[in-house]
Amino acid sequence: MKNYSKNATYLITVLLFSFVTMLLIIPSKCEAVSNDMQPLEARTADLVQQPRYIIDVPPRCPPGSKFVHKRCRVIVP
């Protein structure tokens, strides 16, 4: 006679592992579907970066020089 308890234990282990795997995978799929069902404006609002306010301040030049054409130039008298 075959050992049916060993086969049953193996079958229960496989079924339990499959059930736990489904419990982990299905919620993530549902979340992805719910994100796709949002209006396009709501999804693109998350993707658009906020504009950065860049203030163009010229660098400080050493004494006796002047900032000309994006560089510090020494003024010759």
From Swiss-Prot:
It comes from the Eukaryota. Its main location: secreted. GO terms for biological process: defense response to bacterium; defense response to fungus; innate immune response; killing of cells of another organism; venom-mediated perturbation of sensory perception of pain in another organism. The modification Proline amide is found at residue 77. Residues 33-52 form a propeptide. Pfam families: Secapin. Expressed by the venom gland. Disulfide bonds join 61-72. The lineage of its organism: Eukaryota, Metazoa, Ecdysozoa, Arthropoda, Hexapoda. Serine protease inhibitor which exhibits antifibrinolytic, antielastolytic and antimicrobial activities. Displays antimicrobial activity against bacteria and fungi. Likely functions in the innate immune response to microbial infection and possibly in the venom, as an antifibrinolytic agent. Induces hyperalgesia and edema mediated by leukotrienes when injected into mice. Does not induce hemolytic activity, mast cell degranulation, or chemotactic activity for polymorphonucleated leukocytes (PMNL). The keyword Disulfide bond applies. Belongs to the secapin family. GO terms for molecular function: serine-type endopeptidase inhibitor activity. GO terms for cellular component: extracellular region. Residues 1-32 form the signal peptide. This is Secapin-2. It is found in: Secreted. Keywords: Amidation, Antibiotic, Antimicrobial, Disulfide bond, Fungicide, Hemostasis impairing toxin, Immunity, Innate immunity, Protease inhibitor, Secreted, Serine protease inhibitor, Signal, Toxin. InterPro entries: Secapin.
